[in-house]
């Protein structure tokens, strides 16, 4: 959640953020009213409790003849205290509810507008020029007996698939390359749970307006769409030592997404699916270091795409395209020859203290005072990378030239059937 002090003391900052997101600003006034109602309820409860304490002392020192009347008054006062406590709890619940509904405050650096207002920061690599009509990744994968969508549909339904033979080996090679990069860069590896409690999913900002994108089990647990969720909850209700720098993790997991809002989009192949693999970077840092850490995460993602010899561009995402938790976000988009366009294959987000406030993750400074950490995340490798590898490195006969960095992991220079 956002810093309540910012909402109470400088509500115009929150109103501007809501405006940039294209969302209602009325929730700001609703939240401020709820805050005032809470303060009134707290004051009323504390006043009655003070009266109750005075009366208790009076009863203790009273004469026997006065005690029945004092007890009658005490019983009436106890009922008023009980009602006041209930009103305070009700007011607090309303305040917390509205506070949780407000998305993170958008960075002043984030562009205004929707998707077409995203700012391209840079473009890296040469777009491949083919002397033949490039095939799409599914055609290539089927020719190589590496991707089997039809049997995925038969077994699990639409947007499922099998990676087979070279397809499975290629994904594992990509993941291992990313893992090696992460370990050499000092990240700690985690293999994370893919089932989490509702409070962890809520804490990371994936419920509310995003609830339709995640799978909820009858038990109440949620399947995670990214290991970001589990890693964000990993240090919940803890005080971290970040005095020597950021705490950085790389979490591997299978990921599950309903893709409820993408009906009819990317129905061919493995670009947008219900289950995929991902290695996710996640950082806990001092809030003043979050901008620098975001740049570090993006630099790691760029190293990975450069190793895979994939042309890409980096875009600063417009405010209306940001998720609930993100204050700022960069997308890294790979060139997809069959579509003659750029497509997002990985992203990096600065969530500032938004998730940490919800999950109660703090640090202690040199003076002994505690504060909330900032959390950031970014994908280092995912199944979607296979789309860009197959299409950018295809040859006229349907074989795939293996990027040099993957050759030691695959044991050859070319993938062919």
Swiss-Prot record:
Q: What is its EC number?
A: 6.1.1.11
Which keywords has UniProt assigned to this entry?
Answer: Aminoacyl-tRNA synthetase, ATP-binding, Cytoplasm, Ligase, Nucleotide-binding, Protein biosynthesis
Which cellular component terms (GO) are annotated to the entry? Answer: cytoplasm
Matching CDD domains, A to Z? SerRS_core (cd00770)
Molecular function (GO) terms listed?
A: ATP binding; serine-tRNA ligase activity
Residues annotated as binding L-serine: 226-228, 280, 379
Q: Which residues bind ATP per the record?
A: 257-259, 273, 344-347
Q: Kindly list the residue ranges recorded as spanning the membrane.
A: none
State the pathway, as annotated in the record: Aminoacyl-tRNA biosynthesis; selenocysteinyl-tRNA(Sec) biosynthesis; L-seryl-tRNA(Sec) from L-serine and tRNA(Sec): step 1/1
Top-level taxon of origin: Bacteria
According to its UniProt record, which reaction does this protein catalyse?
A: tRNA(Ser) + L-serine + ATP = L-seryl-tRNA(Ser) + AMP + diphosphate + H(+); tRNA(Sec) + L-serine + ATP = L-seryl-tRNA(Sec) + AMP + diphosphate + H(+)
Q: Does the keyword Secreted apply?
A: no
Q: What Gene3D superfamilies does the annotation carry?
A: Bira Bifunctional Protein, Domain 2 (3.30.930.10), Serine-tRNA synthetase, tRNA binding domain (1.10.287.40)
List the GO biological process terms. selenocysteine biosynthetic process; seryl-tRNA aminoacylation
Name its cellular compartments.
Cytoplasm
- The record's note on its domains: Consists of two distinct domains, a catalytic core and a N-terminal extension that is involved in tRNA binding.
List, alphabetically, the NCBIfam families matched.
Answer: serS
Concerning PANTHER family, the annotation shows:
SERYL-TRNA SYNTHETASE
Q: Which family does it belong to?
A: Belongs to the class-II aminoacyl-tRNA synthetase family. Type-1 seryl-tRNA synthetase subfamily.
Which HAMAP family does this UniProt record tie to the protein?
Ser_tRNA_synth_type1
Its annotated function is as follows: Catalyzes the attachment of serine to tRNA(Ser). Is also able to aminoacylate tRNA(Sec) with serine, to form the misacylated tRNA L-seryl-tRNA(Sec), which will be further converted into selenocysteinyl-tRNA(Sec).
Query: Self-association or partners: how does it assemble?
Result: Homodimer. The tRNA molecule binds across the dimer.
The protein depicted here goes by the name: Serine--tRNA ligase
This protein's species is Tropheryma whipplei (strain TW08/27) (Whipple's bacillus)
């Amino acid at each position: 959640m956002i810093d309540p002090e910012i909402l109470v003391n400088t509500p115009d900052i929150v109103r501007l953020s809501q405006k940039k997101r294209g969302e209602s600003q009325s929730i700001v006034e609703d939240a401020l009213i709820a805050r005032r109602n809470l303060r009134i309820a707290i004051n009323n409860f504390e006043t009655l409790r003070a009266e109750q304490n005075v009366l208790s002392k009076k009863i203790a020192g009273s004469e026997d003849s006065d005690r029945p009347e004092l007890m009658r008054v005490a019983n009436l006062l106890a009922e008023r205290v009980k009602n006041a406590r209930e009103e305070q709890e009700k007011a607090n619940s309303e305040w917390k509810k509205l506070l949780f509904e407000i998305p993170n405050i958008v960075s002043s650096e984030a562009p205004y507008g929707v998707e077409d207002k995203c700012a391209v920061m840079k473009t890296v690599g040469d777009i491949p020029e083919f002397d033949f009509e490039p095939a799409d990744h599914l055609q290539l994968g089927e020719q190589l007996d590496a991707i089997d969508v039809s049997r995925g549909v038969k077994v699990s339904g639409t947007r499922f698939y099998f990676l087979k033979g070279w397809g499975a080996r290629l994904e594992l090679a990509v993941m291992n390359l990313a893992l090696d990069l992460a370990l050499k860069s000092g990240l700690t590896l985690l293999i994370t749970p893919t089932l989490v409690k509702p409070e962890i999913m809520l804490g990371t900002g994936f419920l509310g307006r995003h609830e339709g994108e995640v799978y909820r089990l009858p038990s109440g647990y949620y399947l995670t769409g990214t290991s970001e969720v589990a890693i964000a909850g990993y240090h919940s209700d803890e005080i971290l030592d970040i005095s020597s720098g950021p705490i950085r993790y790389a979490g591997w997991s299978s990921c599950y997404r309903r893709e409820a809002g993408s009906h009819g989009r990317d129905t061919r192949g493995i670009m947008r699916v219900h289950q995929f693999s991902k290695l996710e970077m996640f950082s806990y840092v001092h809030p003043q270091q979050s901008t620098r850490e975001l740049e570090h995460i993006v630099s790691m993602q760029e190293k990975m795409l450069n190793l895979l010899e994939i042309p890409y561009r980096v875009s600063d995402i417009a405010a209306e395209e940001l998720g609930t938790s993100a204050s700022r976000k960069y997308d890294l988009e790979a060139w997809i020859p069959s579509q003659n366009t750029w497509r997002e294959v990985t992203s990096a987000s600065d969530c500032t203290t938004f998730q940490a406030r919800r999950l109660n993750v703090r640090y202690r400074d040199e003076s002994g005072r505690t504060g909330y950490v900032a959390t950031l995340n970014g994908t280092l490798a995912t199944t979607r990378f296979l789309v860009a590898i197959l299409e950018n490195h295809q040859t006229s006969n349907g074989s795939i030239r293996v990027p040099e960095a993957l050759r030691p992991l695959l044991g050859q220079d070319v993938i062919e059937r």
